[in-house]
């Protein structure tokens, strides 16, 4: 029974991601804007002004903990470091059952290093603090995203 619930939650997460993609597509204001699903991240938005790589998370049955977004943040940081000065913004967009009060925004470098980068991973990166600070200036975290049905309503309202 637990696997069935897990599969249902996973499928709902994919629907949530796809709905987010559709919503962003409907919100495009310019014919030169582009949206890619499963590009750098789950949803990549490119406008005249900026490019944003967005990781979507839907955990309706999960309390938010820093560990839930740590791995996606490390992937984003790794991408940022490999594409230095690429101008890409990064975003975590997620819905969680509870626990949003655990993350106080904006996050600073010490908090980022102690909660999102393991010591082993940090040593392997050979990264300077100024690079992390630069990455953080290009990062947005929204862990109070719209609930599944609310996001669907947003789509219908855009139509």
PLM feature spans:
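Catalytic centers of nucleases
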Residues: 7-11, 15-78
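Acidic metal-coordinating catalytic centers involved in nucleic-acid phosphodiester chemistry
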Residues: 1-8, 59-159
């Amino acid at each position: 029974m637990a696997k069935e619930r897990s599969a249902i939650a996973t499928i709902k997460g994919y629907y949530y991601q796809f709905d987010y993609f559709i919503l962003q597509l409907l919100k495009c204001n310019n014919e030169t804007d582009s949206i890619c699903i499963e590009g750098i991240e789950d949803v990549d938005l490119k406008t005249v002004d900026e490019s944003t790589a967005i990781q979507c998370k839907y955990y309706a049955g999960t309390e938010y903990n820093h560990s839930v977004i740590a791995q996606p943040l490390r992937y984003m940081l790794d991408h940022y470091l490999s594409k230095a000065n690429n101008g890409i913004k990064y975003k975590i967009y997620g819905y969680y059952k509870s626990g949003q009060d655990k993350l106080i925004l904006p996050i600073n470098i010490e908090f980022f290093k102690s909660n999102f980068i393991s010591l082993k991973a940090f040593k392997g990166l050979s990264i300077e603090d100024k690079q992390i600070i630069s990455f953080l200036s290009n990062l947005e975290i929204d862990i109070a995203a719209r609930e599944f049905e609310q996001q669907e309503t947003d789509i219908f309202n855009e139509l």
